[in-house]
Amino acid sequence: MLQQLLITLPTEASTWVKLHHPENAKEGAPLWEDVTKMFEGGALLSQDADETQGESLKDELTPGTPTTDSQELLTFKDISVDFTQEEWGQLAPAHRNLYREVMLENYGNLVSVAGCQLSKPSVISQLEKGEEPWMTEKEGPGDPNSDLKSKTETSASNAKYNILQEQLYHGMMMERFMRDDVIYSTLKKVSEYDDELEKHQDRHGRNVRQTIMTHKKRSQETYKFGKNIVSSNVVIEQRLRKCDTPRKRNKCKSDVINHPTSYIRVKTYECNICEKAFKQPIHLTEHMRIHTGEKPFRCKECGRAFSQSASLTTHQRIHTGEKPFECEECGKAFRHRSSLNQHHRTHTGEKPYICDKCQKAFSQNISLIQHLRTHSGEKPFTCNECGKTFRQIRHLSEHIRIHTGEKPYACTACCKTFSHRAYLTHHQRIHTGERPYKCKECGKAFRQRIHLSNHKTVHTGVKAYECNRCGKAYRHDSSFKKHQRHHTGEKPYECNECGKAFSYNSSLTRHHEIHRRNVFQNNI
């Protein structure tokens, strides 16, 4: 069925459909509708398909040979780009090699589509011999005997046919980009395609220009660059359409070439271990250090090593105290931009991370992850000394200080040290007199939240801690633990002088008074 559809088309339109690679009639039918709408009016779709099939393709593709309808068929000139000696000298070596490769491939594609041997242009001969393919100022691009006069006098149907020529050129170039996935080839094609449109505007005027731009937009939506290039030309053309004057247009074209990542999203560098792809080779190099474990960036202050230079820069702010990211709302400063972004949510009240089990919302993703462990019971962080497990790594770090005796938090008022930052915060309220937790019932204030919770039981009369041995109940957890020592016989408080042990800390304190009195009496 697909072959029958192709037979009913003229050779040029059939070639256009084949470039879209339909695998069956079902996929080919929409293309048939497109090409019918595109060329309805008699420009290309002959009323008699057999007559179109019988024409000699070789004669049609010979430059300078007019057709019966004054329609110009696709020649190598239409898909080639010429440079003067000055322009050629401004091209970088990589761009020259790319130009040589694309031009040779375009000529090969044209010969393949035509199905016959075309006369070889001089520029192709120069490229094959390795010569520089620039032309003199007196020469015009392409064949000097081209049908320029007939182009300027073309009708609306000729304009539609020129659209097909551009579509065919676009399709042949598209095959190269989908196969190679090279960003510079894409940019080169966009630049050449845009130059062709500017020439077309000069030949046919603004009304035909609008027709071509409308058709080109539909063409861009039809073609897909694959997973790595997503609608890049549509973005570029929308940007270029806003440039009305030649000066603005040249600036826009320069922006496209100089800043390709603003317009085209391409991932061309792939990790051969995990197959993750990156836009730039430096990002791939940094990623490979995850697999190799290499950490070439070392802090001179503490000797800590990092795999990325940016990580070292961020770490050094710990030593310098630099906090370059400041909140405009409250003036609080942060070392990391991500910390500032998280802090902003305290002002906006935004909590985008929601637990799907209890619908509790959190402002940070890490808070949600930690919360989920309360549902799963997971405690992934284990102490190597005693085997105790924790849900959060900071809780493990604080616990390890019990074994090491480390107390890194010191009070600036009395130099007392603490193993936890929270303990230091509570202690500093002794010096400042701050009591932020206030009872709503009686107005009494407390330094710690736990003290307020214990106090509330006085008003409620609740004694939540009940001994399962004797049934005695207590309001406070600390009182309940002391009572249990009556049953267990535990005496955790031991005198350093005589080794006597006690169940309560207060009993040990009173016992110490005995030793102090004895020492005082002996000195007398």
UniProtKB/Swiss-Prot annotation:
Subcellular location: Nucleus
Keywords from the named record: DNA-binding, Lipid metabolism, Metal-binding, Nucleus, Repeat, Transcription, Transcription regulation, Zinc, Zinc-finger
Major location (coarse): nucleus
Zinc finger (C2H2-type): 269-291, 297-319, 325-347, 353-375, 381-403, 409-431, 437-459, 465-487, 493-515
KRAB domain sequence ranges: 74-146
PROSITE patterns assigned: KRAB, SCAN_BOX, ZINC_FINGER_C2H2_1, ZINC_FINGER_C2H2_2
Domain SCAN box: 1-39
Protein's GO biological process: lipid metabolic process; regulation of lipid metabolic process; regulation of transcription by RNA polymerase II
Bias (Basic and acidic residues): 131-152
Domain of life: Eukaryota
Annotated region described as Disordered, given as residue ranges: 49-69, 131-155
Protein purpose: Putative transcription factor that appears to regulate lipid metabolism.
Family of the protein in this entry: Belongs to the krueppel C2H2-type zinc-finger protein family.
Protein name: Zinc finger protein 69 homolog
Organism: Bos taurus (Bovine)
